[in-house]
Amino acid sequence: MDNQKEEILQKIEEAEYVLVGLGQEFDMEFFLQSREDYRRIREQLQQQNVLWLLPYVEAQFRKQYMPEMEAEIEKGLQKLAKVLEKKSYFVVSSSMNHKLAEVPWKKMLLKKERFVAPCGDWTKKQCPDGCEEGIQTVTEADEEQLQESFKKLQTNGFSVPDLGKCPKCGKKLVLNNVYAGRYDEKGYLKTWTEYQNWLQNTLNHKMVLLEIGEGNRFPTIIRSPFERIALFQQK
């Protein structure tokens, strides 16, 4: 294991560009699925057509039942960010675990964000119909609503949190993630464009691809693009 770690660090040191993919395993769904209460709540969210609440529900389960594991993962990612800070790098994630976004993914001196999560999470809210004015940051009052809703779910109850209304159409806002009926992708598009521009600059340069914890839930975000990038880099 130590030899493998040293080999990876050496490859990163020698590379001009580093692309990191953080996958769905950071949601810890495998461990969550072992809990009957999690499976019950997830099924209830599906039945009520409010699966957009799932990223918040999963965050609460991790906080309650897996705090040590999540803290260890966060510590490891902070170390990775420190290793990468002198490199030209980008991190793309298919996970909806907001803890990944809280890691200081910034390039030294430039202090520019180097992280994009196209699936969203629970920290922004949107109009269910995708109105332009809909995307907003979740407030402390919203978090209280989310917490109240989660507590009811834990006791076999149910309520949809009141996250406010869309200023344009008046419909109740939902969390901005891929489980929203009409996912408003404007929440991440600016950083995604920066990521695509960064990728264009990597052609014909020495590059390392580091894929961690990815599965097949959303293969178009990490798995398939990484395979294509690796193929182009070999040519």
For each predicted feature, which ranges?
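Conserved catalytic alpha/beta core of Sir2/sirtuin-type deacylases, generalized to analogous enzyme cores
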Residues: 1-235
